[in-house]
Amino acid sequence: MRASFDTNILVYAVDRAEERKHSLAVEVIGWASRADCIFTVQALGEFFNVVTRKTGLDLAEAEGFIDDWRSVFPVASATPNCLTSAIQAVHHHGLTYWDAMLWATARDA
């Protein structure tokens, strides 16, 4: 089964405010680099928004993290079919829309 990450894991990987979460996120991303894992455009975009607006990370530094991850992981974009699948997952499984979209994008990648 292919894995992907919610934005929070990516944020914790660069934000040292909560050291335990930071360490775990770095460890998990390291594991993922040796597994069948993708990143989504959605998660990378949300990461950029959060770390530059809420943690004060410099724009270039945030872009550097994204570039580094893109060199290691395939990056998938949502499709119209992902939209349909995400909406169905909200209806049938109670997921939030954005979590459902991450799931659908990773599944279809």
Predicted features, each with a name:
Residues 1-39, 54-67:
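Short, well-structured N-terminal submotif of metal-dependent ribonuclease cores
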Residues 5, 39-41, 77, 97:
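Short beta-strand scaffold positions
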Residues 32-35, 71-72, 93:
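Structured helix-beta-strand junction loops
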Residues 48-49, 70, 87:
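Amphipathic alpha-helical segments within well-ordered protein domains
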Residues 49-53, 107:
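Short glycine/serine- and small hydrophobic-enriched flexible loop segments
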